[in-house]
C-alpha cells in the first residue's frame, strides 16, 4: 500500500468551540471562579456577574476556543437563563460545600430546569462544582455521589476554591473535556461497561486494523494503529506492558502474542474508567465517528468535483487496496469469496451492500461465488454508476486510514471531458459503457450473461428476482485491459436522455422474430443516426433458423446504408463459454469512436484487436496461475 502523510483531526471531527455556562444559587462563588481563572488571583471585589470570557484556542489543552458564561439571578431574567441553557455545550452547577441549601437546590431546582430546557435526544453534559472548599475540613463527595449515580448526564464532580485557586483550571478543563470527550455515548456507569454503540464502533475499528484477518492485532498492526491514531509508535517494551495489563485481567485478551477483540475492548473500557476518555475519542474520531458514534458525512462523502461529460474510475492505488481487501477475506485461497467470506468482509458495513443480483452482474465460479475478477468488476461498476456510494463503501472499509490518505476521494480518477477525447482521437478511460437495446425477448440477457462467460445452460438457472440489468467484465483490445459495462435498456417507444448516454450502442434483434429488427432500426433513427455514438447491430440466436425481417430494408442493407459494420451473428447456446468477439468489437468502437466506418468494416482491423485480446488473455491466465501459486 502507498505510504503517505497521516491525516490530522479535521475541524468536523470535534466541536469548533466550547461554550461553558455556570449556574447555581446566589453567592456560591460562580463569578469568583471565573475571575480567579482569568486573573490567577482571588478578586477582592466581585461584580454581580462576569462578562462573557473567550479563551483562545492556543492556550487551551484541546486547542479549541472556549467561551465561559456567568449567570446572575439578580441581573438576568428567566427567559435569558433559558436562552443561555439552550446555547451551552456544558453546564457547571456550582454549589458551596459549606451551604447545604445550595447542595439541595442542585436536584430540586437546577437539574430539572436544565432537563426541561434541553432536547431529550441531545445529551447536555453537567459538571457539579463544589466551591469554597477552603472554608471546611470535610468533603461534600458523600452527599454528591448519590446525585451523580442518579443522573447519568453528570460527567464529574470537582471540589475547588476560588480563594486558594485550588482546582480552578482543572474545573474548566473537565468542562471542556465533557464536551469534546463525553463519557455518555461511551460508557454506562450503572452497568460499569461500554455502551453497545461504542462496542460496535470499536469492533469495526478492530476489524479494519486486523489487516491479516487472523482475529488478533499483532505487534506490526498495533504499531500501525498507534501511529495513525496518535502519530507515534509504541516501543517494544510498551507494547509488551500493554499486553501484560490485558493478560492480568482477561484469560482470552491476548492470543499468540496478539491482542484479541476482547482485549482491545477491555483496554478502552479501562481508559474510560480511569478518566482517559480522550484516548478512546481520539481513536473513534480518527476512524470517522462523531459524538453520536455515527460515521460523519465528511468522512463518508468527501468532496469530489465531477465536471459534465466526465466519468469516474478507480485508480491504481484503489485497485491495490481492493486486491488486499479481497486477499484478507479469501481465507481458503480459492480466488473466490464464499457467502461466509463475503459476510465477514461486510461486517465493517452497517448493512449488506450487495444483493443477489450482483452475482449475475459480475463473474462467479461454478458455485456462484464472486471471483477475484468479479469483485474488482463490481467495485468498478459502482464507481462508474454511483461514485458517492463507492466513496461511502470505501469509507466503511477504512480506505483513507489504511492507505494514509486525506480521504477516499484519492481513490478516484475523474476522466477528462469526452469531447477532448474525440478531438485528440485517443482516450485515457478504462471503463466503457455500452447500452444494449432491443425488444423484450430478443436475447439481450443472453448478451449480458455471455460477457461473464455464461452459456445458455447456465443462464437458465438464474432466478427472475435475481436478474441484473448490468454486466461488467474485462476485455482486451490491442493488448490493453479495459472494462466493458453492458446496460440492458428496457423496451420503450422513446428513450430517455439517461438511456442514450453511453460510449457505444449494441442494437440486438432476434433472427427468429420477424418484427424484432424494426425496433432497432427505429431507435437508431430516432436517437443515434446523427450522433457520434458508434453502433453495432447484433443478430441474436443465430444458431436457430433465421426468418426474414418485416422491415423495408434488410439488416445487412441497413448497416451498409448507414455505414455501420455488418450485423454480428451471435449465440449463447454453446457447449462452452460463448464467443467474446462482439465484446472486443464493442469495446474497440467505444475506445476509437473516431475510426472511419471503412476501418470498422476491415477484417484486419478486428483481427489486430482480437489478436491482442487473445495474447493478453493467455498471458493474463499465466500470471493469474503464478499469483495463485504465490498465495
Swiss-Prot record:
Residues recorded as binding GTP 1, renumbered to this chain, are 27, 29-32, 72, 131-132, 134, 162-163
**Residues annotated as binding Mg(2+) 2:** 441
Listed GO CC annotations: mitochondrial outer membrane
Judged by the first EC level, this protein's enzyme class is: hydrolase
Catalytic function, reaction form: GTP + H2O = GDP + phosphate + H(+); ATP + H2O = ADP + phosphate + H(+); UTP + H2O = UDP + phosphate + H(+)
Give the residues the record marks as binding Mg(2+) 1: 31, 70
PTMs?
A: Ubiquitinated by PRKN during mitophagy, leading to its degradation and enhancement of mitophagy. Deubiquitinated by USP30. Acetylation on Lys-105 decreases sensitivity of mitochondrial transport to elevated Ca(2+) levels, increases mitochondrial transport and promotes axon growth. Deacetylated by HDAC6 which blocks mitochondrial transport and mediates axon growth inhibition.
Taken from the record's topology, the Mitochondrial intermembrane segments are 629-631
Q: Which InterPro entries does its entry note?
A: EF-hand-dom_pair (IPR011992), EF_Hand_1_Ca_BS (IPR018247), EF_hand_assoc_1 (IPR013566), EF_hand_assoc_2 (IPR013567), EF_hand_dom (IPR002048), Miro (IPR021181), Miro-EF-hand_domain (IPR052266), MIRO_dom (IPR020860)
Give TM regions.
606-628
Task: Say where the cross-link Glycyl lysine isopeptide (Lys-Gly) (interchain with G-Cter in ubiquitin) occurs.
Answer: 166, 248, 585
Q: Which residues bind GTP 2?
A: 441-446, 460, 541, 543, 571-572
Q: Which PANTHER family match?
A: EF-HAND CALCIUM-BINDING DOMAIN-CONTAINING PROTEIN 7 (PTHR46819:SF1)
Q: What is known of its domains?
A: The Miro 2 domain is necessary for efficient ubiquitination by PRKN.
Q: Which family does it belong to?
A: Belongs to the mitochondrial Rho GTPase family.
> What biological function has been recorded for the protein in this entry?
Atypical mitochondrial nucleoside-triphosphatase (NTPase) involved in mitochondrial trafficking. Probably involved in control of anterograde transport of mitochondria and their subcellular distribution. Promotes mitochondrial fission during high calcium conditions. Can hydrolyze GTP, ATP and UTP.
This chain's protein is named Mitochondrial Rho GTPase
Which species is this record about? Rattus norvegicus
Gene symbol here is Rhot1
Amino acid at each position: 500500500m502507498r505510504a503517505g502523510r497521516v491525516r490530522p483531526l479535521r475541524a468536523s471531527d470535534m466541536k469548533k468551540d466550547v461554550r461553558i455556562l455556570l449556574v447555581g444559587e446566589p453567592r456560591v462563588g460562580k463569578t469568583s471562579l471565573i475571575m480567579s481563572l482569568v486573573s490567577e488571583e482571588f478578586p477582592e471585589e466581585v461584580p454581580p456577574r462576569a462578562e462573557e470570557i473567550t479563551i483562545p484556542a492556543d492556550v487551551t489543552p484541546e486547542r479549541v476556543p472556549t467561551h465561559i458564561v456567568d449567570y446572575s439571578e439578580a441581573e438576568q431574567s428567566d427567559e435569558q437563563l433559558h436562552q443561555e441553557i439552550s446555547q451551552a455545550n456544558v453546564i457547571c452547577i456550582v454549589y458551596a460545600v459549606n451551604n447545604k441549601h445550595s447542595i439541595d437546590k442542585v436536584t430540586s431546582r437546577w437539574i430539572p430546569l436544565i432537563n426541561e430546557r434541553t432536547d431529550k435526544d441531545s445529551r447536555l453534559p453537567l459538571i457539579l462544582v463544589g466551591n469554597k472548599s477552603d472554608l471546611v475540613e470535610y468533603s461534600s463527595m458523600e452527599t454528591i455521589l448519590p446525585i451523580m449515580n442518579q443522573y447519568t448526564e453528570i460527567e464529574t464532580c470537582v471540589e475547588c476554591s476560588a480563594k486558594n485557586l485550588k482546582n480552578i483550571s482543572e474545573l474548566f478543563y473537565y468542562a471542556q473535556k465533557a464536551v469534546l470527550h463525553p463519557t455518555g455515548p461511551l460508557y454506562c456507569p450503572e452497568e460499569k461497561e461500554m455502551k453497545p454503540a461504542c462496542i460496535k464502533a470499536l469492533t469495526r475499528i478492530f476489524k479494519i486494523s486486523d489487516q491479516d484477518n487472523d482475529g488478533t492485532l499483532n505487534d506490526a498492526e498495533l504499531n500501525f494503529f498507534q501511529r495513525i491514531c496518535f502519530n507515534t509508535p509504541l516501543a517494544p517494551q510498551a507494547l509488551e506492558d500493554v499486553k501484560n495489563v490485558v493478560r492480568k485481567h482477561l484469560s482470552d485478551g491476548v492470543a499468540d502474542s496478539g491482542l484479541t477483540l476482547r482485549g482491545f475492548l477491555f483496554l478502552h473500557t479501562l481508559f474510560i474508567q480511569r478518566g482517559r476518555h480522550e484516548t478512546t475519542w481520539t481513536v473513534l474520531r480518527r476512524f470517522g465517528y462523531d459524538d453520536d458514534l455515527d460515521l460523519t458525512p465528511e468522512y463518508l462523502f468527501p468532496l469530489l468535483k465531477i465536471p459534465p461529460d466526465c466519468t469516474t474510475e478507480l485508480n491504481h492505488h484503489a485497485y491495490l487496496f481492493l486486491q488486499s481487501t479481497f486477499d484478507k477475506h479469501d481465507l481458503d485461497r480459492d480466488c473466490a469469496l464464499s457467502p461466509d467470506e463475503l459476510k465477514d468482509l461486510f461486517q465493517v458495513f452497517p448493512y449488506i451492500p450487495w444483493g443477489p443480483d450482483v452475482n449475475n452482474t459480475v463473474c462467479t465460479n461454478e458455485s456462484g461465488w464472486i471471483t477475484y475478477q468479479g469483485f474488482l468488476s463490481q467495485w468498478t461498476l459502482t464507481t462508474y454508476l454511483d461514485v458517492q456510494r463507492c466513496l461511502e463503501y470505501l469509507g466503511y472499509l477504512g480506505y483513507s486510514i489504511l492507505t494514509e490518505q486525506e480521504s477516499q476521494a484519492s481513490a478516484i480518477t475523474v476522466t477528462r471531458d469526452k469531447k477532448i477525447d474525440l478531438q485528440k482521437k485517443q482516450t485515457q478511460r478504462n471503463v466503457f459503457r455500452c447500452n444494449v437495446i432491443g425488444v423484450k425477448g430478443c436475447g439481450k440477457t443472453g448478451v449480458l450473461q455471455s460477457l461473464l462467460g455464461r452459456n445458455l445452460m447456465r443462464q437458465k438457472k438464474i432466478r427472475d428476482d435475481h436478474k441484473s440489468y448490468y454486466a461488467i467484465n474485462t476485455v482486451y483490445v490491442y493488448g490493453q485491459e479495459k472494462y466493458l459495462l453492458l446496460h440492458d435498456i428496457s423496451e420503450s417507444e422513446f428513450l430517455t436522455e439517461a438511456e442514450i448516454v453511453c460510449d457505444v450502442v449494441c442494437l440486438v434483434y432476434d433472427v427468429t422474430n420477424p418484427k424484432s429488427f424494426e425496433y432497432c432500426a427505429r431507435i437508431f433513427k430516432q436517437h443515434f443516426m446523427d450522433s457520434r455514438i458508434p453502433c453495432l447491430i447484433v443478430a441474436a440466436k443465430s444458431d436457430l433458423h433465421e426468418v426474414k425481417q418485416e422491415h423495408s430494408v434488410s439488416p445487412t442493407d441497413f448497416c451498409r446504408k448507414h455505414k455501420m459494420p455488418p450485423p454480428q451473428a451471435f449465440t449463447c447456446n454453446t457447449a462452452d463459454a460463448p464467443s467474446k468477439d462482439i465484446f472486443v468489437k464493442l469495446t474497440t468502437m467505444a475506445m476509437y469512436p473516431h475510426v472511419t466506418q471503412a476501418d470498422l468494416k476491415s477484417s484486419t482491423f478486428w483481427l489486430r484487436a482480437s489478436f491482442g485480446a487473445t495474447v493478453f488473455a493467455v498471458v493474463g491466465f499465466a500470471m493469474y496461475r503464478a499469483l495463485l501459486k504465490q498465495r
